[in-house]
């Protein structure tokens, strides 16, 4: 079992790389933020309804010598999402990674799910992730070093559970979107890669958010992996 990544204030070697993490203020997103910081990334932390939490985390990183920025945007609205990515690029001068951790999950019985519920899940979980990746990828294409896109999905799309019909429908689009982005960006710059992490760490008794963060680092750092969906679920489907 992986131990949480070491985070020693003042001891981080900066690499000049910059990452944007949507939904980075708590949970898996915050673990990804800390993991990226431990690898020398400057980090932009996105939040919407909980921007203050993102600011607190950004302040903690700054105190440890990590360049950081708290940003906000409603992921349902294309314009603000594009403006957020542009702000990150303007602030740091580049974008090397984007990790889309933000998602909503409204649980409830199938008979109570409305078309509006479904649209809301797709707008945020798919539309917001797509626009953030599309906009950030446009910056990466222009960089000789390229960059990495990580879409966060849910491994439960292959073994659905009750009460999550709208959420899992939106998550089912993530693998296809990842593969499409991988092909599209590689046609412009083969150093721009898009991959997906299918996480169910929270549903496994030994799973932690750090396990997911380690997978994100692996996919970002391996330059020869593109267009895959990596399950991080403790072998759940084999049980």
Annotate each language-model stretch with its function.
Residues 133-134, 179:
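A short, exposed helix-loop element centered on a Lys and neighboring polar residues
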Residues 150-173, 178-187, 200-204:
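Catalytic loop of short-chain dehydrogenase/reductase
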Residues 109-110, 117-122:
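Substrate-binding pocket helix/loop in short-chain dehydrogenase/reductase
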């Amino acid at each position: 079992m992986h131990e949480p990544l070491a985070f020693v204030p003042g001891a981080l070697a900066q690499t000049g790389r910059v990452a944007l993490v949507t939904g980075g203020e708590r949970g898996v997103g915050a673990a990804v933020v800390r993991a990226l910081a431990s690898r020398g990334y400057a980090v932009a932390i996105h939040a919407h309804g909980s921007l203050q939490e993102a600011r607190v985390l950004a302040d903690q990183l700054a105190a440890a010598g990590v360049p950081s920025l708290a940003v906000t945007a409603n992921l349902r609205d294309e314009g603000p999402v594009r403006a957020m990515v542009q702000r990150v690029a303007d602030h740091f001068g580049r974008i090397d990674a984007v990790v889309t951790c933000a998602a909503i999950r409204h649980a409830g019985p199938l008979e109570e799910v409305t078309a509006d519920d479904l649209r809301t899940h797709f707008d945020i979980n798919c539309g917001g992730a797509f626009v953030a990746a599309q906009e950030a990828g446009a910056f990466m294409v222009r960089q000789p070093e390229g960059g990495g896109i990580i879409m966060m999905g849910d491994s439960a799309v292959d073994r659905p559970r009750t009460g999550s019909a709208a959420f899992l429908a939106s998550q089912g689009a993530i693998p296809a979107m990842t593969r499409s982005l991988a092909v599209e960006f590689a046609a412009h710059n083969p150093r721009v890669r898009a991959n997906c992490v299918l996480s169910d760490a929270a549903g496994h008794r030994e799973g932690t958010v750090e396990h997911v963060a380690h997978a994100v680092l692996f996919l970002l750092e391996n330059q020869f992996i593109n267009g895959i969906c990596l399950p991080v679920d403790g072998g759940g489907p084999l049980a």
